[in-house]
């Protein structure tokens, strides 16, 4: 799988050279300023730290005092998600949590499912900000706010939902139901922290990618946010190619076009180059984040 991923990345590099030329692609950053690239990279690295804190706060008894180890785990998991196709890297999370922290596979899997639902909602909410900003209408912000608070409503109704499920499920399934409960935030305060961290994380990431796309592709606010949404949706849905090669830039292009970007001639060519640069930025941030996490993580012994 690793060799196949490396081969696809190499072909992607050849494709970029053939279509645009690496000099043309990289020159966009030269025009925009390498300082902007550095700022974008630092902000993306910050989202990885926040993502780690969310899990650290989610499982305080198991992860307490070992933030560096958890940061390394999260970065390895994130890198596997990027490099492996069809979201197969997700399977590494419960296995890594079991190995490093002794956390049950069912519990960590349930928690991962809940966090991914948080992620998808926050991703859509963050992208919706671009539409609301572009529209500038009160009704647009009202719809956005209504969508934003949906997770809070769902969490408030979890009690009746679990009681109903306990009545209709067979006894063998009740153990799994208990594990799913354990995967949820413990209380309203824990939910608020997890939800808040998720919103900040994704609003930051989408805003950074939208800024980069607008800077490099000369896109409107709505098209920039649409492109960021399209790229990230392509990575969280099970259509993700190894390292996002092809699918991530295509998602950016489709999202930007859906939100009003030009579809022919120079605007489309500039959008394509900006999409490739945004994709490369995501890959580089993941590689740098993983390398840095290896430096800060202290070696730990396997828990029996």
Which sequence ranges carry the predicted segments?
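Extended non-transmembrane interhelical loops and adjacent amphipathic helices
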Residues: 71-102
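Re-entrant/interfacial helical elements at transmembrane boundaries that shape
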Residues: 88-100, 240-258
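Membrane-interface helix-loop-helix junctions at boundaries between adjacent transmembrane segments
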Residues: 99-120
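Membrane-interface helix-entry/capping residues at the boundaries of transmembrane alpha-helices
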Residues: 92, 109-112, 228, 275
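Predominantly cytoplasmic-facing regulatory/coupling regions of multi-pass membrane proteins
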Residues: 1-76, 132-237, 262-304
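Hydrophobic alpha-helical transmembrane segments of ABC transporter permease domains
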Residues: 113-133
């Amino acid at each position: 799988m690793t060799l196949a991923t490396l081969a696809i990345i190499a072909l992607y590099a050849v494709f970029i050279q053939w279509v645009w030329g690496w000099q043309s692609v990289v020159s966009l950053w030269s025009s925009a300023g390498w300082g902007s690239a550095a700022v974008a990279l630092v902000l993306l690295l910050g989202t990885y730290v926040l993502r780690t804190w969310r899990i650290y706060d989610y499982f305080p008894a198991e992860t307490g005092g070992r933030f560096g180890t958890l940061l390394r785990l999260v970065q390895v998991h994130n890198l596997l998600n990027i490099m492996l196709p069809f979201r197969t890297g997700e399977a590494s999370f419960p296995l890594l949590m079991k190995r490093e922290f002794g956390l049950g596979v069912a519990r960590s899997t349930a928690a991962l499912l809940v966090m991914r639902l948080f992620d998808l909602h926050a991703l859509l909410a963050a992208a919706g900000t671009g539409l609301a900003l572009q529209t500038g209408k009160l009704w647009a912000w009202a719809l956005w706010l209504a969508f934003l608070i949906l997770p809070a409503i769902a969490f408030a109704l979890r009690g009746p939902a679990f009681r109903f499920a306990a009545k209709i499920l067979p006894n063998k399934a009740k153990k799994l139901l208990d594990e799913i409960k354990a995967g949820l935030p413990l209380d309203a305060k824990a939910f608020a922290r997890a939800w808040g961290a998720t919103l900040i994380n994704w609003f930051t990431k989408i805003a950074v990618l939208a800024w980069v796309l607008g800077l490099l592709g000369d896109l409107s606010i709505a098209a920039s946010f649409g492109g960021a949404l399209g790229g990230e949706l392509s990575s969280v849905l099970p259509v993700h190619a190894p390292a996002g090669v092809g699918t991530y830039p295509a998602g950016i292009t489709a999202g930007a076009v859906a939100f009003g970007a030009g579809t022919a001639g120079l605007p489309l060519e500039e959008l394509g180059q900006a999409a490739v640069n945004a994709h490369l930025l995501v890959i580089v941030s993941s590689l740098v984040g993983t390398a840095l996490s290896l430096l800060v993580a202290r070696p730990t012994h396997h828990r029996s």
